Amino acid sequence: MTKDTTSPPDQAGGTVAMAVLNAIQNPVVMVDESGFIAFANWEAEAFFGAAFASGALPDLDIHSFGSPLLALVDQVRTQGSPVNEYRVDLSSPRLGQDKLVDLYVAPVLSEPGGVVIVFQERSMADKIDRQLTHRAAARSVTGLASSLAHEIKNPLSGNRGAAQLLEQSVIDDDRALTRLICDETDRIVSLVDRMEVFSDERPVRRMPVNIHSVLDHVKRLAQSGFARNIRITESYDPSLPAVYANRDQLVQVFLNLVKNAAEAVGDRPDGEIMLTTAYRPGIRLSVAGTREKISLPLEFCVHDNGPGVPADLLPHLFDPFITTKTNGSGLGLALVAKIIGDHGGIIECDSQNSRTTFRVLMPASKDASLEDASSASSTGPSR
């Protein structure tokens, strides 16, 4: 016996259908024959940034007339068959930048002229692809650092020694030149030392770590130094499980991110940095060469209200030697990406409308609760 899907569902069936649609993690909307939104699930309301009981599709400011989405709706109505469209750009002032989606558009047989639209955001997939590219770039720096470090540092040491000897025999007016040679030699050696960090493949000690303890420690360091005049707030999920990691390296990661945020905020009187944690189920990353998928439910964010990151720099932000700072080396964020990648996680950056967010996604520890991690991670530093 088949159910008559052309008749209106009873109240119980309608309630179940609504619950099912609201449980779907993708935005779903239904458009009636007049182009009005007849239904939107919770994810759609979050996606569009509005709660709509009814509203014309063009009024959603997705695109002006002739947009790919509106054209797909017309095509489905005309042909009466579903259509898939991939990598559709829905970026707009309302939705923000980097709104790349895959669309599934299908007719609603029980509603003449009705069309259902399912949005699959590609932002996360594309960011993961970029993260893998960042790791490859970090590996290239690793190989370069490993092979060239000694070849560069040894002759530089000789040059510096020769400059120091010259300094003892030249006239006062020329000592500034020998001092310049020493200073520039020290600067290059310092850069090579930072590059050598990428080639350090020694295993590090990992244990269940309370991320809130790490963030609180970083906050204290920041407020006693470079961020003493900046308001730092936090919004933590107290039920968050522990992260299996090296505590010292996590401190290094978030101290770097908070320092970048403080430099972005600068001296503005309303400058603010916010630290947040949350549990986000449903994010899984495939492991290359296997069928295994790693779940990355732990989300740690550093937000700031600085001027933001230039759009043309965002895709390359974690590449080595990319920086907007006058005297920056461009290795800080590359090292952050390497550490997070070594822990099986990913890092991404969103920047728009004077708000920048660095988001770290990591796997949870299976061996201990957050309370256990608090006592374990407070026993002392780890290598």
Curated annotation (Swiss-Prot):
Signal peptide: none annotated. Disulfide bonds: none annotated. One of its GO terms (biological process) is nitrogen fixation. Member of the two-component regulatory system NtrB/NtrC, which controls expression of the nitrogen-regulated (ntr) genes in response to nitrogen limitation. Under conditions of nitrogen limitation, NtrB autophosphorylates and transfers the phosphoryl group to NtrC. In the presence of nitrogen, acts as a phosphatase that dephosphorylates and inactivates NtrC. GO terms for molecular function: ATP binding; hydrolase activity; phosphorelay sensor kinase activity. It catalyses: ATP + protein L-histidine = ADP + protein N-phospho-L-histidine. Autophosphorylated. The gene is ntrB. This is Sensory histidine kinase/phosphatase NtrB. Residues 147-366 form the Histidine kinase domain. It is found in: Cytoplasm. The modification Phosphohistidine is found at H150. The keyword Glycoprotein does not apply. CDD domains: HisKA.
